[in-house]
A protein has these predicted regions:
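Positively charged n-region of N-terminal signal peptides that target proteins for export
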Residues: 1-5
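Bacterial N-terminal signal peptides
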Residues: 6-16
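Sec/Tat signal peptide C-region and signal peptidase I cleavage site
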Residues: 17-21
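Loop/turn elements at helix/coil->beta-strand transitions in domains of secreted/extracellular proteins
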Residues: 23-27, 55-60, 94-100, 132-138, ...
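Conserved SGNH/GDSL esterase-like catalytic core that processes O-acyl groups on lipids
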Residues: 26-28, 34-122, 146-159
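Structured segments of extracytoplasmic/periplasmic soluble domains
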Residues: 33, 37, 50-55, 89-93, ...
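Active-site segments of SGNH/GDSL-like serine hydrolases
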Residues: 102-106, 126-157, 179-182
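Catalytic His-Asp segment of secreted/periplasmic serine-dependent ester chemistry enzymes
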Residues: 144-217
Length: 217
């Protein structure tokens, strides 16, 4: 009889574990080359995914692209407007529980791009909400770059991204602002192009994303 109860308890535990394992929250990382990764620099996902696996915290990365780190929706060289054009299709195919957006590079300061980037970012978020009204958006204030004057608009952009997150949160959307600019120094945290993260920079980005993910209810 005792042996039978042991078998029942083991079966219940296994079934419960399987249910919990099946409840992993899906995460879609959307962005440019900083999200997609490359041979000449370190991608934050390489660090983030490994750290989350160590903690067994139940996040599953999804997306149309895939590398050794994870699935994702990162596209090298794409600015926010280009990401907007593909976002509806991506979100329809991969309606994630959580969308991480790091987008704002690949524009030019001389074009005064900030207003357009904000407008396109909001439209991307609307597309994510259309695919999953319960989605949580982790919206990044993007990492600074030393490639100047091209990226001299980034400080202004990050102020406006914070305002966007605040406005959308006020109307009831699940928006979490993730400040990747704070503590990130392009002089020490990027490779020679002064834009893409080195190992130290990728670690800083991964830590910020992980803190935001683990803080979610």
């Amino acid at each position: 009889m005792i042996k039978l109860w042991h078998l029942i308890l083991i079966a219940l535990y296994t079934a419960g574990f399987s249910v919990m394992a099946g409840e992993a929250r899906t995460v879609l990382a959307l962005g440019d080359s900083i999200t997609s990764g490359g041979k000449s620099f370190v991608c934050y996902r390489e660090v983030l995914v490994q750290e989350l696996k160590k903690r067994d915290d139940g996040f599953q990365f999804i997306g149309p692209e895939k590398d050794k780190a994870s699935a994702h929706a990162g596209y090298g060289g794409k600015n926010t407007k280009a990401l907007l054009k593909i976002s509806e299709k991506v979100f329809a195919a991969y309606p994630a529980d959580i969308v991480m957006i790091h987008s704002g590079h690949n524009s030019f300061s001389k074009d005064k791009p900030v207003a357009g980037i904000i407008r396109d970012t909001e439209a991307i978020i609307e597309n994510a909400l259309a695919a999953n009204p319960e989605v949580t958006i982790l919206l990044a204030q993007v990492i600074p770059a030393g490639k100047l004057p091209k990226y001299s608009y980034i400080p202004e952009l990050n102020v406006e991204l914070a305002d966007l997150a605040s406005r959308l949160s006020t109307r009831g959307d699940n928006i979490v602002l993730v400040d990747h600019a704070d503590g990130f120094d392009w002089k020490t945290d990027t490779v020679g192009d002064k834009v893409h993260p080195n190992a130290a920079g990728a670690r800083k980005m991964a830590d910020k994303w992980m803190a935001a993910l683990l803080a979610l209810p």
